[in-house]
């Protein structure tokens, strides 16, 4: 977990509840995956690039660049939101789990994430 994630849990979170994260974009996604080995990120990118290729002749949505339609498809598969339990004031995640912002454009812009904390 990042230092910011830990600080957020210590300072702002309820003892029990949920953290809901929502990314406000259609060519990026949020995911939870292993964060101990950076090869996981590399492998995940390779897998998605193999499954959903750029520059396919059947894409009709091409005005925003050849990487845009594949980015939409990848984001649809992964999803735009996460819900993480909060237990004893901390994110209740596995020891190897981390939150990923999955950028699927080759040159993605700034991304905005809405974080909603619910609980008591």
Segment roles from a protein language model:
Residues 20-31:
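Short, charge-patterned binding micro-sites
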Residues 94-103, 108-120:
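C-terminal binding/interaction regions
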Residues 13-16, 49-51:
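Terminal, compositionally biased segments used for targeting/anchoring and flexible tails
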Residues 1-10:
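Single conserved hydrophobic/aromatic residue that forms the stacking wall/gate
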Residues 22-24, 87, 102, 116:
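Short beta-strand segments
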Residues 42, 48-94:
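Mid-chain, well-packed structural core segment of small domains
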Residues 29-41:
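Glycine-rich loop at the start of a catalytic domain that most often binds anionic cofactors/ligands
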């Amino acid at each position: 977990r990042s230092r910011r994630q830990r600080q957020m849990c210590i300072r702002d979170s309820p003892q029990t509840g949920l953290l809901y994260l929502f990314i406000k974009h259609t060519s990026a996604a949020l995911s939870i995956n292993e964060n101990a080995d950076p090869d996981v990120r590399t492998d995940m990118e390779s897998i998605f690039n193999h499954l959903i290729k750029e520059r396919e002749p059947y894409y009709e949505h091409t005005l925003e660049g050849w990487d845009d339609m594949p980015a939409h498809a990848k984001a649809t598969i992964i999803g735009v939101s996460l819900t993480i339990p909060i237990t004893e004031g901390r994110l209740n995640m596995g020891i190897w789990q981390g939150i990923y912002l999955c950028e699927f454009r080759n040159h993605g812009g700034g991304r905005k994430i809405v974080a909603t904390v619910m609980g008591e």
